[in-house]
Amino acid sequence: MLVFQTKLQKYQLATLISSVISNFLIFFATITPAWQVADDLDADRYVQSGLWLYCPGQAQCWYIFSDSLINYYEKVDVCRFFLIGDCRKKLLRTPYFFGWHYAVLILNVISMICMSLCAAAVIFSYVKPARSRISVIMLDVFAGFASLLLCVSLIVFMVNAEMLESKYLIGIKNTYEKEYGYSYYLAGLAFVISVITVLFAALVSTYTFLFPEEVADSEYTLKMSNNQFAVRYNNDLPQPYQPPMSQLSMQIPSTEHGSYIAGAISPRGDFKSQTRHFYSY
């Protein structure tokens, strides 16, 4: 049975909740395509570009991981005057996928794995208070590493999203600026909650290593809760029928013809007849 009476147990619960929420947000942000969005007025469509999904308006979305086989550039004949041979390139149309999308995707996946291990570590530290020190150390490592990777992921995305070739959507006639979509803001919210998770994990470590009485109290309350649950479970089990003592000891008074031997009643309430023989007279 779950109990959260001590401060250590409450901080463990807060760490678990924040890690689960952060992991869910970054997972939802990763699988959705709205990291960069733009209105293509030439084609009258709302384009969403994600880390692995591309949704061109009302058309069906498709997943892509590499655009290396598609040539989006053409060389310009006019080169710079002072830099002979340094010919600029002209972007024909906006690529669906850049290499840094793949890097951000990998960082997000590793961050989700670390956050899941963080949740597992805090659960183990709650269930086994006597062996919680190793799990608390792992909790701090996984929580901090997940938050750091998510921060690096967002920085990589923001820096590359502001580049000229990925900031604008080249339409049929005009060029339209891309904006950040809800997926990006969900990832940012996940990072904020991951930082809160790191703070809660630090509090769990503080109470585990500096306040051993909190660990002892947590172990005691958890053990008492389990004992009470076992007693309550045993009381709820169906009990066998027990007839009253007055029914078991009921006797019929003697008559003028002799004494009457009453039938015996078993503990289950079944009637047992007794046979009279010549020794009874």
From Swiss-Prot:
Signal peptide: none
Residues spanning the membrane: 13-33, 104-124, 137-157, 184-204
Membrane-related topology note: Multi-pass membrane protein
Assigned keywords, A-Z: Membrane, Transmembrane, Transmembrane helix
Record-stated family: Belongs to the Clc family.
Cell compartment(s), UniProt: Membrane
Keyword Transmembrane helix included in the entry's annotation: yes
The UniProt record lists the keyword Transmembrane: yes
Main localisation: membrane
Domain of life: Eukaryota
Name under which the protein is recorded: Clc-like protein 5
Gene Ontology cellular component terms for the protein in this record: membrane; plasma membrane
InterPro entries: Clc_prot-like, PMP-22/EMP/MP20-like
Pfam family, one: Clc-like
